[in-house]
Amino acid sequence: MAKLNAYFGEYGGQYVPQILVPALEQLEQAFIDAQEDPEFRSEFMTLLQEYAGRPTALTLTRNLTKGTKTKLYLKREDLLHGGAHKTNQVLGQALLAKRMGKNEIIAETGAGQHGVATALACALLGLKCRVYMGAKDVERQSPNVFRMKLMGAEVIPVHSGSATLKDACNEALRDWSATYEDAHYLLGTAAGPHPFPTIVRDFQRMIGEETKNQILAREGRLPDAVIACVGGGSNAIGMFADFIEEESVRLIGVEPAGKGIDTDQHGAPLKHGKTGIFFGMKAPLMQDPNGQVEESYSVSAGLDFPSVGPQHAHLNAIGRAEYDNVTDDEALEAFQEIARHEGIIPALESSHAVAHALRMARENPEKEQLLVVNLSGRGDKDIFTVHAILEEKGAI
């Protein structure tokens, strides 16, 4: 029986209760078989094109980098049906679930984007859907909660722990261990127990594949750097995957520095965590001195995650990708700038990557460089959050 590699260097693995091992093995085999089945590939590609709207545009910014010699392109995952890159891999996993004969889907969500994507795929493909969401996130993402319910999903608020994404993840896994015979756990990021990090990456890698073709057609060369925000890391690994072998291209992941990387209110486990076991995998993790999982913090619910996918941990360890961070304030500034000067309202998550690209352009305005930011989602879900912050600052 063919097997996928469970580890990226020392990171990854499958740290789950024994009861879940058969479900994960079944999933791995179904994925391997599906990848070799032209009918599965064809159905997946048809859904991506005719339902989700792929390929997404690669947009050259006209005004953001004025006064510098940087050319900045945006990979427009915000234009995808559902409003973010999440839809790509959700369609793939939902098709896999049907292939395995599962008729129920369990998911977790932070910002609500993965929940919405899961709900739309389940509505389309006739699957039952329940979504676990931290009670705090239910409050700060009410439009997405209503969207999920409109599409027939049951949204289950989680009040335990910090009532955010990590707690929703734990509850979803708990549910799955009782229901795996009928239900598929549709994990939302390139993290968690093997084979999820590999499956999610492969169902997101069209982001980088399209970007490579589009930039070569437009510029006749590869970019100097591709930049993406990193929470769990699926939009970033989707962008990076096709460039890993292209050594001339810098891969830059941007973690949330929250209220400051030297405070205890950030979400940057890659740079400021210690290796531990969390959510079924071995990965960098924000921990207190006693080894307990520390609360992560970010203004954007989708980056508010105390760990990171194992492939990012490996790319960081071997020096192939570099990981920096951006504060809430810098992300909010970039959010306003791109809205004001390009007519695009990005997700707060994606604004972290935009902020980093602008920092690169402005730190060295005379440097000629070609940058691509993965604009992973649109910002409709964030306008109330941003409005409240700007109002408090007296900025509006």
Curated annotation (Swiss-Prot):
UniProt cross-references to CDD domains, sorted A to Z: Trp-synth_B (cd06446)
EC annotation from Swiss-Prot or TrEMBL: 4.2.1.20
Top-level taxonomic group: Bacteria
Keywords tagged on the record: Amino-acid biosynthesis, Aromatic amino acid biosynthesis, Lyase, Pyridoxal phosphate, Tryptophan biosynthesis
Cofactor(s) demanded: pyridoxal 5'-phosphate
Pathway: Amino-acid biosynthesis; L-tryptophan biosynthesis; L-tryptophan from chorismate: step 5/5
Pfam families: PALP (PF00291)
InterPro entries membership: Trp_synth_b_CS (IPR006653), Trp_synth_beta (IPR006654), Trp_synth_beta/beta-like (IPR023026), TrpB-like_PALP (IPR001926), TrpB-like_PALP_sf (IPR036052)
MF terms (GO), sorted A to Z: tryptophan synthase activity
Top EC group: lyase
GO cellular component, one term: cytoplasm
Modified positions (N6-(pyridoxal phosphate)lysine) in chain numbering: K86
Reactions it catalyzes: (1S,2R)-1-C-(indol-3-yl)glycerol 3-phosphate + L-serine = D-glyceraldehyde 3-phosphate + L-tryptophan + H2O
Protein family according to the UniProt entry: Belongs to the TrpB family.
Chain's role: The beta subunit is responsible for the synthesis of L-tryptophan from indole and L-serine.
PANTHER family for the chain: TRYPTOPHAN SYNTHASE, TRYPTOPHAN SYNTHASE-RELATED
Subunit structure, interactors included: Tetramer of two alpha and two beta chains.
Designated name of the protein: Tryptophan synthase beta chain
